[in-house]
Amino acid sequence: MIYKRSSQLFADAQKVIPGGVNSPVRAFKAVGGEPIFIEKAEGAYIYDEDGNKLIDYINSWGPLILGHAHKPVIDAVIEKAKKGTSFGTPTEIETKIAELAVKMVPNIDKIRMVNSGTEACMSAVRLARGFTGKEKIIKFAGCYHGHSDSFLIQAGSGAVTFGTPNSPGVTQGTAKNTLLADYNDLDNVRKVIEANKEEIACIILEPVAGNMGCIPPAEGFLEGLRKLCDETGILLIFDEVMTGFRLAAGGVQERAGVKADIVCFGKVIGGGLPVGAFAARNEIMDYLAPVGPVYQAGTLSGNPLAMAAGLAMLTELDSKRGIFESLEKKTKYLHEGMEKVLTENKVDFTINRIGSMISVHFGTEPVTDFASAAKSANLGVFNKFFHGMLENGIYIAPSAYETWFISDALSYEDLDTTIAAVDKVAKTL
């Protein structure tokens, strides 16, 4: 494929934007080469500035679960935009999307809208600290909760890719209150709690890790965390920015049957526009300003265009619950097809999948945590695989540590085309 215009646009962008991108993973530094610039997208496909058509497995890093330019979402945004783009006042549509989210998600009474997943997680931790009166938090190595200072301590994806799991600019004062534990290791979590008795406000985690590849929770892990939190008074925060409204209408809480105290959302809830949210039971949410002492605010929080997109998206997912079964079947079909051709081509690999989230690791050991993800990354093989897939019209995440997100817009013909491309590329690895 030819990427002449993308190359020129990247050169232009680097003159006025740091690294030429507004989020590091987009720069292709992890895989080499130059990023492609997208002109438009529809359904399962993206079209770059050079006219190349690609089957998309990123879907804007997860929000576009029904595919690009989904008509009900686009129509809702257009109609709302005709009435104005932002008011800085309450609007009816904020209440409507809140009512629908509370209906769909178990164990929440109220929800606060913000502008990103980072903001949601940052606010949730502040709320947990305010509610409990304690300062320390536990996060898991390799789990990513956005670029807030408290979370850039052995974060996943971009931080790992660039070899800088601790970002300059994060102070020791901030870092000392973030305690690290190993994902899928309850004994390790118990030890961390024991060493910091009566000091921990919350445990925050991706209930399905998505930033060290896709790593589902081990059997009993989430249940064990719930039990530990009940025993110690620590709040359990599920960062469902990736999994919320994707793995089930009610997210991981519904799918796994495990209750969180606070839940964070992003991606799908905005329908492709910038939206984050955090939610909990009344007792916790009523600690938020203006009714409680914990301050949180935002000029564009609850923006009417974003709320229109989110409401249209959630309405589709709520009214057509068969979408989740369809996504499960399509992702399983892709999983089994890739597994077959990679095995036939004698490639060392493991594939992790849950629902419509999937990742390929080029190693033979099971990938269950940060250490095993790093061991199985095999960046040289992955980078060759990435560029081979791109050359064959398939756009996957440009990082060995990122999850692929399946949209329901994908047809089985698209999946067969993808499996054939994997077969072709595997012969070169």
Swiss-Prot record:
<dbReference type="InterPro" id="IPR004639">
    <property type="entry name" value="4pyrrol_synth_GluAld_NH2Trfase"/>
</dbReference>
<keyword id="KW-0413">Isomerase</keyword>
<dbReference type="GO" id="GO:0006782">
    <property type="term" value="P:protoporphyrinogen IX biosynthetic process"/>
</dbReference>
<dbReference type="InterPro" id="IPR005814">
    <property type="entry name" value="Aminotrans_3"/>
</dbReference>
<dbReference type="InterPro" id="IPR015421">
    <property type="entry name" value="PyrdxlP-dep_Trfase_major"/>
</dbReference>
<dbReference type="InterPro" id="IPR015422">
    <property type="entry name" value="PyrdxlP-dep_Trfase_small"/>
</dbReference>
<keyword id="KW-0663">Pyridoxal phosphate</keyword>
<dbReference type="GO" id="GO:0042286">
    <property type="term" value="F:glutamate-1-semialdehyde 2,1-aminomutase activity"/>
</dbReference>
<dbReference type="InterPro" id="IPR049704">
    <property type="entry name" value="Aminotrans_3_PPA_site"/>
</dbReference>
<dbReference type="InterPro" id="IPR015424">
    <property type="entry name" value="PyrdxlP-dep_Trfase"/>
</dbReference>
<protein>
    <recommendedName>
        <fullName>Glutamate-1-semialdehyde 2,1-aminomutase</fullName>
        <ecNumber>5.4.3.8</ecNumber>
    </recommendedName>
</protein>
<keyword id="KW-0627">Porphyrin biosynthesis</keyword>
<keyword id="KW-0963">Cytoplasm</keyword>
<dbReference type="Pfam" id="PF00202">
    <property type="entry name" value="Aminotran_3"/>
</dbReference>
<dbReference type="GO" id="GO:0008483">
    <property type="term" value="F:transaminase activity"/>
</dbReference>
<feature type="modified residue" description="N6-(pyridoxal phosphate)lysine">
    <location>
        <position position="267"/>
    </location>
</feature>
<comment type="similarity">
    <text>Belongs to the class-III pyridoxal-phosphate-dependent aminotransferase family. HemL subfamily.</text>
</comment>
<comment type="subunit">
    <text>Homodimer.</text>
</comment>
<dbReference type="GO" id="GO:0030170">
    <property type="term" value="F:pyridoxal phosphate binding"/>
</dbReference>
<dbReference type="GO" id="GO:0005737">
    <property type="term" value="C:cytoplasm"/>
</dbReference>
<comment type="pathway">
    <text>Porphyrin-containing compound metabolism; protoporphyrin-IX biosynthesis; 5-aminolevulinate from L-glutamyl-tRNA(Glu): step 2/2.</text>
</comment>
